[in-house]
Amino acid sequence: MFITDPISDMIVRIKNANQRKFKTVLIPYSNKKAKILEILLNEGYISSFVTKGEGKDKTLEVALKYKGNQSAIIDFKRISKPGLRVYAAANNLSSVLSGYGTVIISTSKGVMTEKQARKENVGGEVLAYIW
């Protein structure tokens, strides 16, 4: 199956698994998705993730995080889409919910949070907001 926007597909899979209270979710592998999941892990939105399989069957198994009966992820939104790319310069990077959430940005130095991009003084494509 061909997916036109793999990052949106990953976000929808995570949101659907959260709504159904699943412990894990499988996502087709890509380097960019692995970097995004690394950010989610460092920011405390997921418990862990591991890479499984090889070649075309390679997947990312994500262990979702819950606090009691409540998901650690309140909402996860895709910002820049294939039909409408959204870019931000280093001095125009905004935060989500006054710093409560996380902005994920793809820069020339890799995928990082808005805070890291400010420290590195780089802008880029705004991939997603999560809180």
Curated annotation (Swiss-Prot):
GO biological process: translation
PROSITE patterns: RIBOSOMAL_S8
InterPro entries: Ribosomal_uS8, Ribosomal_uS8_CS, Ribosomal_uS8_sf
An annotated GO cellular component: ribosome
Gene Ontology MF term list: rRNA binding; structural constituent of ribosome
Coiled-coil region(s): none
Pfam families: Ribosomal_S8
UniProt keyword list: Ribonucleoprotein, Ribosomal protein, RNA-binding, rRNA-binding
Record-annotated disulphide pairs: none
Superkingdom of origin organism: Bacteria
Subunit field text: Part of the 30S ribosomal subunit. Contacts proteins S5 and S12.
Function according to Swiss-Prot or TrEMBL: One of the primary rRNA binding proteins, it binds directly to 16S rRNA central domain where it helps coordinate assembly of the platform of the 30S subunit.
Family note: Belongs to the universal ribosomal protein uS8 family.
Protein's UniProt name: Small ribosomal subunit protein uS8
